[in-house]
Amino acid sequence: MSEENYMRIIDLRGRKLTRAEMLDAMPRAEMGTNEATELVQPILDDVKARGAAALRDFAEKFDHIRPENLRVPVEVMKAAVDELDPEVRAAIEESVRRSRAVSASQVPAPFHTDLAEGARVSERWIPVQRVGLYVPGGKAVYPSSVIMNVVPAQAAGVESLAIATPPSRNNADGLPDKTILATCSILGVDEVYAVGGAQAVAMFAYGAKGSEPQDGEILCDPVDKITGPGNIFVATAKRMVSGIVGIDAVAGPTEIAIIADGGANPSWLAADLIGQAEHDELAGSVLITDSEDIAAKVQEDLKYRVPRTEHAERVETSLRGRQSGIILTDGIEQSIDAANAYAAEHLEIQTADPDAVIAKIRNAGAIFRGPYSPVPLGDYMSGSNHVLPTSGTARFASGLGVHTFMKPVEVIEYDEQGLKTLAARVNAFAVSEDLPAHGESVLSRFIDDPYNKETIKEQEEQAGLR
């Protein structure tokens, strides 16, 4: 490990930046999306054409194991619950309880607006019928992501839930991690596939025919929407099938930003930056502060902590990467401007007056208020959702929630008098757009000959439309 500082300094002090310059100053990872697209397209095509046979081939190629059962038997998931460590099970069940409480409060209520006598517009929220939930594997296993995907979908009333998660080389039969399977069973999800990567996205988007007797004729039916985080290949595949199915977001590497003033605890700040860097070499860890003293103390604390953490090499790579850094500002207002430009997936506020800062934050996936609301709390057990927008997309997107799994549908309900009041104006609007048949559709309900343009106004007057 080097004695050099782990994080580069981005000094904004004394600089009056335009919006474009501020966005450009933010630390970001470089993503090879073009290369990923070239690799993903053949995977999508092959799964669409060959179904389960292609899924097994890709498992062997990428996961180095060929699962006998692509769909996990229900009895295996039930057995995984019985084998679960009691403390882990208690933690999972507490996380589920808190997530369900928050999700229940998010269910939108229908409403209606009466615009006039006989003129009503109402809105219904309808759950998506079938959803495919992706739970990543790789450097870690994420039973927490099962909870974050499944609980809001269930609260929304989704009828059919399917989960895909990579097969595990730690299991001789190629089944996924047992903690993930146990979590699925605890949540009552019995359609789980040992399929990872872009091929899982293809399976959800197109469905997959069986190739072995245990698959049945159809291994997996296509879904209406795909949610859940994943690596660049999963994210690219989701982007490429978007429009065929709905998606929640195209996720990039995970990230944290912390706004801290001179009163923050530098050891806690360092620990929180390391906690995010632990995810991935491309994870972004960003400290935004107007205190040069805090910045220096965090750098020193990192020198102590990084070599002692379990995944020190991964953490060091992340902290030294171009996607991480310490942003020095002139004051709290510039810190807020930088945070809004960065639009972090996770934004911690560790300042003397966190509420004043939060009031000015426009762009963040989730905000963690104060020193006792660290990001790992949200990762596992705060009740909030940890599937959040990354790579600056929090400027226009939000995290996963009940709304992700529902569609607002407007119901237009006018009676004869309600339509009659507007008929002439609808016709005038339609004619102005050179779409006269639109107006004729409405007028046909009240006059005999809407096609006679010479007498149209006279007919409207006789019908009481004017």
Q: What name fits each language-model region?
A:
Residues 279, 287-364:
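A glycine- and small/hydrophobic-rich beta-loop-beta segment
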Residues 113-182:
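Conserved small-residue-rich beta-alpha loop and adjacent elements
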Residues 341-465:
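C-terminal core of ALDH-fold dehydrogenases
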